[in-house]
Amino acid sequence: MEMTEASKQTTAEGSANPEPDQILSPRRSLELKQKKWWISVSLCIFLVLLGDSLVMLLLNFFYVQDNREDSDQDLQYRGTWLQALVQNAAFPLLIPLFFIFPSPKQNQETTNTRFLSFRLILLYISLGVLVAAHSKLFALGKLYANFGVFTLISATQLIFTAIFAAIINRFKFTRWIILSIIGSILIYVFGSPEFGGEPDENEEFYSIQAWLTFAASVAFALSLCLFQLCFEKVLVKTKRYGNKKVFRMVIEMQICVSFVATVVCLVGLFASGENKELQGDSHRFKKGETYYVLSLIGLALSWQVWAVGLMGLVLYVSGVFGDVVHMCTSPLVALFVVLAFDFMDDEFSWPRIGTLIATVVALGSYFYTLHKRNKKKMVELYQTENNIDV
């Protein structure tokens, strides 16, 4: 009996005065979680850079080899449904990854599962149509607009992303994020790579190119914010994810949205009659039909790499951050294009070298905000666990 009372007293004392390891375990758990988060964000940034670089290199290769300059004006602006399709069609390769990535423990307390599933299906369809529209507009804008017009108008997409994020996602801006946004826009304007498929001076349709590029920018900005809304308000609350953000959600989103976008682009391809011109396009390709097919396959894979990385940044951080990273990759992509091609005596000039330095500042400003946010969580946990004011 005495031993029992002594053991109870010891247990009570142990509960009142827990060991240091017990006190620090929540902090260690949060530190580990934050390290995993930083690794995930870094991986997504790498995927965006890799995908963006491969897309621009292969797009330039495709249009250089396509004998575009020797075609009549009407034919030069064809093939945009094919390019829109290529941006989305490689999603089946992501299906094995969906089953490889682990799924969190299901939340058995989730209610209204049918309502959530219905909302999710509607969002997937809506986002798929929006992505298909952006893909088509992007392909048209690239061909109709010259380099200067396309770059200047495309830079406004980050402004629209910020506006939509404030309205749709209730995004809170800090002075460091605003600095990052301004820097990213300037980086994109002065550091974007040249494009081999842009029109000659006598081919330009100034009113058309401006509106096409503008519409593509708005569609892209809106899609980023809607992706974030879908992640935070719908997908994360489903029973299978149990209120946890995991990379498997990115794969699911990309597969479902790309499926809808692919269907829309296929309908457009056959309805416009572009499918009948595919054989002629392959015959005009300078490197031959084999390289024509391989370049399209490479483009399709590269677009998926880029999209998965971008979607991951939207999940782990925000749509604004995803767009900032996308724009900040432009100087490095331009460097790769300059090394691989020679367009109109294009070179990696001093303004572009300056944008590389500005990229460090722009991303550093946003990273500083993320660091402060994570540090604040650590301080709050320290206060809670130690019951003191800091």
Swiss-Prot record:
Localization: Membrane
Annotated region (Disordered), positions in chain: 1-23
Record-annotated membrane-spanning stretches: 39-59, 81-101, 120-140, 148-168, 176-196, 211-231, 250-270, 297-317, 324-344, 348-368
Name of the encoding gene: PUP18
InterPro entries from the UniProt entry: PUP_plant
Protein name: Probable purine permease 18
Family membership: Belongs to the purine permeases (TC 2.A.7.14) family.
Annotated Pfam families: PUNUT
Residues modified to Phosphoserine: S25
Keywords for the protein's UniProt record, in alphabetical order: Membrane, Phosphoprotein, Transmembrane, Transmembrane helix, Transport
GO cellular component terms attached to this protein's record: membrane; plasma membrane
